[in-house]
Regions:
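Basic, Lys/Arg-enriched alpha-helical interface segments
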Residues: 1-55, 66-72, 81-84
Length: 84
């Protein structure tokens, strides 16, 4: 089982979400502790350990450290904003 760490930038992103969207995203983030590479996740091009999961029009960007069993969530943003 992995530890999930939510970085400050992701905390800010989560606070800005509407309540229904927040309630939709949080279970996906928690599930990363069990399986950091769920079906439908994609490795980001040009990075070693960065991944993304898609939740509707939103993306969760995170890094996996297999040695430390750690998942760091960096961003939770709309798809048109997340890669800027």
């Amino acid at each position: 089982m992995y530890e999930v760490l939510i970085e400050r930038t992701a905390e800010r992103d989560l606070r800005s979400l509407s309540s229904p969207l927040f309630l939709r995203v949080i279970p996906h983030i928690r599930a990363l502790a069990e399986n950091p590479r769920p079906g439908g996740c994609h490795k980001l091009v040009g990075s070693k350990n960065d991944w993304r999961i898609r939740i509707g029009d939103y993306r969760v960007i995170y890094e996996i450290d297999d040695r430390q069993k750690l998942v760091k969530v960096f961003r939770v943003r709309h798809r048109r904003e997340v890669y800027r």
